[in-house]
Amino acid sequence: MNFGIIIPAYNEAESIGVTLQSLLNQTYLPYQIIVVDDGSTDTTAEVVNQIATQYPVVQLVQRSEKGEHLPGAKIVQTFNYGLPYLKEAVEVICKFDADLIFPNNYLETMCQQYNENPQLGMFGGFCYIERNGSWVLENLTNKDHLRGAVKSYRKACFEAIGGLKIAMGWDTADELLARY
């Protein structure tokens, strides 16, 4: 299964390298990783380019146009900017935040779930945060809600729901559209 990962990034120089390394160290490797730099003023682009020289699966796309400043719109606009760069062979489209550290079996687990459940259109995961030296579950949303920070879509599902909506609540709208 070919995973195409799009990572919107803005001033993520301190975290994007760790995020990319956690994806490149997976037991099941991604087919393509696109980092869309949304006009960062730090060294985000340089960090990504340095990694991309060692790993051809990583590609930097720079977005200089300014999108609408509506709640929830900017992240989706930046993600959408990366969509045309996905290769045709991508079977699962992933939208991941730029400040995540993935367990080394994350993509393998995701692949297994998609393979075992042909009707599965979306898959996500839990987010943990470091608090006082320990990793604890971030309880911002209901456990059956797929967090916007870490979402994947079977390509057919993504196309059927018409992609991500440029609006506040995009990460709930996609789930509702996929269910109904």
What are these regions (language model features)?
Residues 1-25:
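N-proximal low-complexity "stem/linker" segments adjacent to membrane-targeting elements
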Residues 76-92:
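Active-site nucleotide-sugar/metal-binding loop of Leloir-type enzymes
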Residues 20-67:
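Acidic donor-binding segment of Leloir-type glycosyltransferases
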Residues 89-101:
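Short beta-strand-to-loop acidic/aromatic patch adjacent to the donor-nucleotide binding site
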Residues 101-137:
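Conserved donor NDP-sugar-binding/catalytic core segment of glycosyltransferases
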Residues 157-160, 167-180:
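A short, conserved alpha-helix in the catalytic core of glycosyltransferases
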